[in-house]
Amino acid sequence: MSMRLYPAIPGTKYLCFYPMDKKRGEQVNWYSTPMPDRARMMQDHGLIGRRFAGTVKQVISGSIGLDDWEWGVDLYADNPGIFKQLIYEMRFDEASALYGLFGAFYVGVRLPVAELGSWLSPGETPASHGFK
């Protein structure tokens, strides 16, 4: 339980964040789908994620009752292209394709707070920070 309450944030170079919900419409409603079906879909969803173990770390925050979205998904990796690959593959699984609602996706470079000023300085370029 402690790991869920206080997740360790990995020291990767890139992060991705997006909010998400499960659909509650008249035609498709995640919460009225029988629990065994939801469990099967989430197991299949998790199997896709496990293929990325070791390259992507995921931290899910529950925000039901605190925000307009039910969850916040944080992904951490040293290669930002892996986010695209993972998200692309997951969009075709049943849980995401039929029931997932996604907000805006944000991808960024992590940097120490002490470097923020130089990143925002005129004349600075990504190359001056080691990016090609």
Residue ranges and their predicted role:
Residues 15-20, 65-81, 85-90:
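Short, well-ordered beta-strand segments in beta-rich or mixed alpha/beta enzyme
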Residues 87, 91-131:
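Flexible phosphate-binding patches that engage nucleotides and nucleic acids
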Residues 25, 80-82, 111-112:
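Generic "edge-of-domain/loop-turn" microfeature
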Residues 1-47, 78, 117-132:
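Short S/T/G/P-rich N-terminal loop/turn motif that feeds into the first structured element of a domain
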Residues 44-70, 86, 97-112:
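Short, glycine- and small/hydrophobic-rich beta-strand elements in well-ordered beta-sheets
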